[in-house]
Amino acid sequence: MPIITLPDGSQRQFDNSVSTMDVALSIGPGLAKATIAGRVNGQRVDACDLIEEDASLEIITTKDEVDGLEIVRHSCAHLLGHALKQLYPNAKMAIGPTIDNGFYYDIDLEESLTQEDLEKIEARMKALAKTKYQVIKKKVSWQEARDAFEARGETYKMEILDENVSRDDRPGLYHHEEYIDMCRGPHVPNMSFCQHFTLLNVAGAYWRGNSDNKMLQRIYGTAFHDKKALKDHLTRLEEAAKRDHRKIGKQLDLFHMQQEAPGMVFWHHNGWSVFRDLEVFIREKLTEYGYQEVKGPLMMDRVLWERSGHWDKYADAMFTTSSENREYAIKPMNCPGHVQIFNQGLKSYRDLPLRMAEFGSCHRNEPSGALHGIMRVRGFTQDDAHIFCTESQIQDEVTNCIKMVYDTYQTFGFDNIAVKLSTRPEQRVGSDEIWDQSEEALKQALESMDIAYEIQEGEGAFYGPKIEFTLFDCLGRAWQCGTVQLDFNLPNRLGATYVGENNERLVPVMIHRAILGSLERFIGILIEEYAGFFPTWLAPEQAVIMNITDKQADYVQEIAQKLQKCGIRAKADLRNEKIGFKIREHTLKRVPFMLVCGDQEMEAGEIAVRTRKGNDLGKFKVDDFVSYIQDQIASRKLNLEE
């Protein structure tokens, strides 16, 4: 007779085993109708799964925007599979998981799907969902599951069973009328919950993410609890498409990618201007916060990577080469090189903390299918730093890092930042005492600055706890950029020591610190955040001076030269075009300030100033405009509204 404890503390006793749906029905038909699944003792279960012992139960309903929505999306992936098998009986189904804001299904199909095909598939999904059929779950033996998929010719499902499921397990088979899929669940009890969805696009994806395997077709979709939420999301996707950094990068002549160098960025003059300004800004912050800048080698002997432990964990992601019977790896990260610099010369406790920063050129062999413009690349530059300190200095150094993180993000207009603190995992190095001290130091550093944070129990690295900083952009998308990671392992592995107060040899604590993460990725984020309307200090072109007739050509040239001598990225546009045409063209190029010179301006020694957003700032004396724009640049004002 299980006793079920509900979230409000009330209890209900049942004579026999009971399901989440049974409990919901005992409370009321309205709740039962809204019930998607349950959370029994913290574990998600299907609404039909039986509870045989005393347990706590949370009923997951359509009001649940996290678990409830994720379950709906997962069930929509199965609905997609159902529709696909009706329309393309020869398709072989691979996997159909949920992802952020949606779901996908990988399928093996000879014919290439088009956008028109997606519309046809979506229409079939809607027709099926409209019937609100029941989803039937059956727990079967491993052999029964394999026989079911073998009878249907589902070779990918058979491979999953063979390689990923124990023979002793009882897999869950979900029956969508004649269609069967396999999943650990939970899923919706019926299709009434899957009414507000759409298919987005189709892309290629290697089976199991391995380029040695067959290329499958991946169909992406999304789903929500109601029509309005779906419409709002699609509106955000439309806006995101307009802001796509690849599209704007081409429009503003910032960079390009090409097949001969997958995942490597070709920076054009305009894009490299943004990159360099970003470096200058970070260098100023490094000086302000007491860092020394270093530069480590791009490539080091395999022996060093083995000593650091990276070879065991990252070998597949490292580019390697050999010379004179020695094997080398191009660095995927900067930390081992920084320890080598620390190890040169005897260090005393008086030398600590030692803050070492580098714009490190790193390379990682990312799967080709994962590459995405400059957001996900193989060659990138990290604004990486490592702090060597004593245990007693941890809190002060972490506080200093956090201040630098927030100071930096504020300059770019990011003020919505989520912070997570990851604590000790079961498998770890270092004593409980140092973990206690370190975790408390990270908490105190955050709390001393009144920063709200979420604790992720057991999610820290084996070598130390960490803080993660996630930015939310204007579209509400999350970008994990900054990290502050303690490391009790690497300094010890690579022989880093310092002389303590009592003349003993001690191993320093190492703090890994990144703010932007990858400069390439961060520039991509900025392009999409600003929609290409960079603040004046970052804009590749900061001002353009235009004449109305040939009569003002010399005056325009004179102004352009003056601005350039004052450190302003300005150019003259003397083309024999109508002034309206020139203004439209430079507006599309997102040039912050457009200076127009006609006869009146030339005679008065002035310029008419307008912004790329169409605001008329009136007429300026040339020197006054120079002071105005120099202030915009020096103060790094956002001036996004202008």
Swiss-Prot record:
Biological process terms in GO annotation: threonyl-tRNA aminoacylation
PROSITE patterns to which the protein is assigned, alphabetical: AA_TRNA_LIGASE_II, TGS
Organism ancestry: Bacteria, Pseudomonadati, Pseudomonadota, Gammaproteobacteria, Vibrionales
Domain of life: Bacteria
SUPFAM superfamilies: Class II aaRS ABD-related (SSF52954), Class II aaRS and biotin synthetases (SSF55681), TGS-like (SSF81271), ThrRS/AlaRS common domain (SSF55186)
Keyword RNA-binding carried by entry: yes
Family membership: Belongs to the class-II aminoacyl-tRNA synthetase family.
Protein name, per record: Threonine--tRNA ligase
